[in-house]
């Protein structure tokens, strides 16, 4: 016998009786006065314009392109409206049209003048990845970390528990070089932003520098740390002095951060201020070095003098990871999605100026160069900071139910994603730390996530052996990528967006493509 | 070559000689003397073999002593040894890992890789159970002269939402006192035992009819709900049903013990 549904309750009946809101735009909607303002420089474009109250995002985009006289080569934009004054200023995104996003919820009325802030979207589009193009064996043990080269998607480096790192040719899907030299697990790898060198940090307390093209070791292993290396970060390319090689910062379990001179093979500075293991180090683009530690603090250093600038204490437990809003610019240096072609040639100086240009563009928010930092912690929360401005956090981001392991800013700094051991990924607004959405789908701890360079997609890797691709716009799961036979520890998206590489406990490097 | 284990058989039959333990003790006490004598007197290949063996023993001993000393000095857990265990990324290094589910899932995968015989079960053969033992005849009718009703004397699993049929039509009764909902399931490789809900009876080796009736006897394959173990498939979905074989006679023990088939 088929089960009969119980009759609707009184409440359900009452709700069914009530008049429903229809998403109809009223016909007598007047025009509204709007003014366009660039999000990076804060300058106004054109004067005040009267637009229909029901103008859609597309229409605004056309109008703006007309105002800027870029009609023949239109740029896509996202729009948001400024609400409030002074310190209480917030941005409200226009998702569909002005009526539905601004007027109907009552953020603004038709009488007000709307200041519409526009942000250009990436003009290129990364295709969704849907399949595994290759599973490459080679490593003799668990793969702990992977990273794509900043200048091309055909090179990738992976570090493994078999004491080696390997450089892979992702076009032919074959190994290129095996970097042998460590006597213990290779825990972290970092490709220098000029694309010429690779640093590998190991459990044997040393760092090795390798030539990324030839696969040979440069100099001797860098010795100095007394415990294993937990993280490394290269000096941003635009900060490197003319004729110098970029320096390297490393953090270690022994509680110190060291800055290394690659040419001399010695350390220049030792920053010992943390009282416990340092978990992550990031070399910022405005002249700060950030380090997070198990002693619950985040410290901001001056890399030139090695002096402590700020001590940020807000977390209640270990700080696991740091992400900077400018990470993408710092990692890719002078390269971008367009220069990843094979025939691209540029001198060091060109790369440097380009890197500075790119950094300034990304760090520019309403006419000011600023770098935001987000820290993830074992106390289940994240904090958003602007260390240049204040030692107080901008925002505390709560919501996760277990330790947050990994945070990443989207390449344009607009969003940030946090991967947690509570099986979920949460998406936050990168500008003010507001909660946007939760991506659920993984059935075990999420270890890491990586953004595509057009900021539309995000891929996450998990203990449940899968990778999942999430669409940021629709806030939905786009594709589920099973294939690994065991936990996936590392994932990275190439700069031009063509490939994703992942590695984990099943000792296979997997490449994914659209 | 000995054709049989006649020495063991003899010992079993007659026992050891009365001074066996004392002789053994004495021989062990003089072991050092024998080794010393060998070390001094052996020549040629035998000396080589002897030296090699002795060297290996000494190395092992020294290693062990050092390990003990270190464990006494700092009292901290062992450092991550590169040779044993799996490598971990930096973000998992200092964390206590709840290991069970992980070990489970990887051991299952290992098994699959080895392509072990799919159809072999821990208990390949069971004692046959006759119909007389399984069923008790119930008399019915006004004069108690009808005997078409049967009652099962063994434990059974009755699915959720089962309703008994009208008395007139119910030929086989599954007593509610003998119904089981949960089983103590042991994971053979981990040696952990968990109390898991039974999902269904997949195969009773005695007869297909017993499978249908859900009779739980030794050797029966049941499906259990393993969702709380947190196993994951290759596709990243949570595994929740897995097969297990009953290892005891539930009607003797009053509980169901089973071993997970991996």
Swiss-Prot record, chain B:
CDD domains from the UniProt entry: NSA2 (cd11381)
Q: Which InterPro entries match?
A: NSA2_fam, Ribosomal_Se8/biogenesis_NSA2
One BP annotation, GO: maturation of LSU-rRNA
Q: Which Gene Ontology cellular-component terms appear in the entry?
A: nucleolus; preribosome, large subunit precursor
- Annotated region (Disordered), positions in chain: 1-39, 61-86
Localization recorded for this chain is: Nucleus, Nucleolus
> What main location does UniProt list?
nucleus
Motif mapping: Nuclear localization signal 1: 11-18
**Stated family:** Belongs to the eukaryotic ribosomal protein eS8 family. Ribosome biogenesis protein NSA2 subfamily.
Role summary: Involved in the biogenesis of the 60S ribosomal subunit. May play a part in the quality control of pre-60S particles.
Quaternary structure note = Component of the pre-66S ribosomal particle. Interacts with NOP7 and RRP1. Interacts with RSA4 (via WD repeats).
What's the protein name?
A: Ribosome biogenesis protein NSA2
Organism encoding this protein: Yarrowia lipolytica (strain CLIB 122 / E 150)
Q: What is the lineage of its organism?
A: Eukaryota, Fungi, Dikarya, Ascomycota, Saccharomycotina
Name the gene for this chain: NSA2
